[in-house]
């Protein structure tokens, strides 16, 4: 529905901002019910190297309160386009790179850094122009990341307990305890 339309809309804008274009498609899927309890809130699965399977971005719907509708656009930009799917697909499709660099070794800090940048790119290229609630979700996610920095300092310097850290995150971000 809306997330697929969102993905199509931002994909159409990508040539205006990037020379390299991902050829692999991405599908948005629900995390299978039988693994929901232990699965992350959202995650990405690479497209098959031979092109036989598109990339997939999975959303965990075990508790829809963890992912209110207004937060899904930013999660989608993070996981799909211009996020993980875009970055990983371009690497996989690159000519002349050894397989170990293009598809085998992933660097989490680089990939997550790119995905956070992708959220910002989406905002900068106007992805939220007609979606004020979606932009609110983007800003809430930025606040969440800033709050994690405070929590890190609280735990390591101020000797906060785990409970104090969670209480802070809930009070500042408005997220549910179960999502932290």
Predicted segments with their positions:
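Long, His/Glu/Asp-enriched segments that create or flank divalent metal/ion-associated functional microenvironments
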Residues: 1-180
